[in-house]
């Protein structure tokens, strides 16, 4: 509850102190702009004074106008259609048009944009769902492709609204998303399916639960409040994700077999191995590595450090 309250205060404050400063209005077309994430970007960019047009599947007869005159085109369609849409849209774009996608997979889309469009290219991945009200306190991963300066105004806008830009290569992004998204979704998906299968009285369980259990149930509820197509597509998006989920399932089975055998010694050893991995020393090092990595790639896109006022 307190986390939601604090985040809500941050978002409200951001909307006051980060009112869009004057910017040159740009012509933007969002392919898939009536989808949930497409609507979010449409609302944010329109509120900032830009001219936003939408191209849906039934609008391709107008593509020459909607795409040919655009300064920025954002591809916001399901993962399985992204590359095909990039290929189709690119034939209408001017060489100076900036092209980006906002799907949760980056290697293939960025490669496709570089192959089919000679102009500015960047992959973006908003690390939040479409239910948020603003970019405040949210992260967006940016994967540079070509002519990065053409996207500087967009990234600066996201930062001005309280967002944080994390710079990554497409390959690093996809590697990290195997864990951040795919296996995490599968783990919570599995627990949700198990609870439904067992017919657990969730309300009764919450009445006698710990704070961590209530938090986990809230996270699972939010997962199942999403589109089932989106959740499944995230898990199945790449072969690497499917293989990682299979390995996670193998780990579950191996640990479950130890429980079935009541092998206390082996379970304690597994716990201690993981405990060592999650030690303070191991967890702090990647953060420093990430900061150094970002310094080497487009450091101008990083947010300034804001003193902790709590």
Where are these regions (language model features)?
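ADP-ribose/adenylate-binding Rossmann-like module
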Residues: 93-108
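Glycine-rich, N-terminal phosphate-binding loop of Rossmann-like dinucleotide-binding domains
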Residues: 76-78, 103, 144
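Rossmann-fold dinucleotide-binding core
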Residues: 106-109, 113-177
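Rossmann-like NAD(P)-binding element
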Residues: 64-92
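Hydrophobic Val/Ile/Leu positions in short beta-strands of Rossmann-like dinucleotide-binding domains
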Residues: 30-31, 75, 142
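NAD(P)+-binding Rossmann beta1-loop-alpha1 motif at the extreme N-terminus of oxidoreductases
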Residues: 2-65
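Phosphate-coordination loops involved in phosphoryl transfer and adenosine-cofactor binding
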Residues: 24-27, 96, 137
């Amino acid at each position: 509850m307190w986390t939601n309250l604090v985040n809500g205060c941050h978002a409200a404050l951001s909307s006051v102190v980060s009112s869009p400063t004057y910017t040159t209005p740009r012509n933007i077309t969002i392919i898939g702009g009536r989808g949930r994430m497409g609507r979010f970007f449409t609302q944010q960019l329109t509120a900032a004074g830009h001219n936003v047009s939408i191209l849906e599947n039934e609008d391709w007869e107008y593509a020459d106008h909607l795409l040919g005159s655009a300064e920025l085109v954002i591809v916001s369609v399901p993962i399985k259609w992204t590359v095909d849409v990039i290929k189709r849209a690119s034939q209408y774009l001017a060489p100076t048009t900036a092209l980006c996608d906002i799907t949760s997979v980056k290697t293939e889309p960025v490669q496709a944009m570089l192959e089919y469009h000679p102009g500015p290219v960047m992959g973006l991945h908003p690390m939040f769902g479409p239910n948020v009200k603003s970019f405040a306190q949210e992260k967006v991963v940016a994967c540079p492709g070509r002519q990065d300066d053409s996207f500087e105004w967009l990234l600066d806008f996201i930062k001005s609204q309280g967002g944080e830009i994390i710079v990554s290569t497409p390959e690093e992004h996809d590697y990290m998303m195997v864990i951040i998204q795919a296996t995490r979704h599968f783990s919570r998906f599995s627990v949700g399916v198990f609870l439904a299968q067992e017919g657990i009285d969730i309300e009764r369980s919450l009445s006698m639960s710990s704070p961590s259990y209530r938090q986990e149930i809230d996270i699972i509820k939010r997962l199942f409040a999403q589109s089932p197509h989106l959740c499944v597509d995230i898990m199945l998006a790449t072969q690497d994700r499917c293989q990682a989920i299979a390995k996670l399932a193998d780990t579950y089975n191996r640990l479950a077999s130890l429980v079935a055998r009541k092998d206390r010694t082996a379970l304690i050893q597994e716990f201690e191995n993981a405990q060592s991995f999650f030690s303070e020393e191991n967890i702090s090092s990647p953060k420093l590595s990430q900061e150094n990595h970002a310094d080497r790639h487009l450091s101008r896109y990083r947010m300034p450090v804001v003193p902790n006022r709590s």
